[in-house]
Amino acid sequence: TIASKIDTLTGILGEFAFAQYMYNDWKKNRVGENKGDVNFKDIEIKASAFPFSESLNLLVREDYAQKRKPPFYVQIIIDVNSNKADKIEKDTKAYIAGWATAKEIDSAPKKDFGSKLSDSGGYKCFYIQIKSLHEMNTFKKDYYNNVKSN
């Protein structure tokens, strides 16, 4: 969902950051190839541009969660100066905040969080606070165990 001037760039940077983490090469991404599909095999990257805080949430739109069920969701926060930022400055940090499973998303509470442009987004999102996500130091092991078992 595009709700601000920087949403597309935020998503792209999130995918680049994850590719660097996962494959030690930011170029091993699927940007431009994955429209309407998960970002990486069995992994959906959820990137947001906000000042980093552990009270932020991994958000998955209810309608998206019904359409596709990647086994893993990873939250990345592009740490901008303001929640109303309309550009991403050079040397801005990306925090790979944590991960959740599709099952955890499906059992999470739902809420309309609005958008950067208005108080109502017109849709509900499943949400899990960043501080409640699995830590990234467990991700690769769980991911590769899941791949082997499928």
Region roles according to the model:
Residues T1-N39, K46-N150:
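Nucleic-acid endonuclease domains
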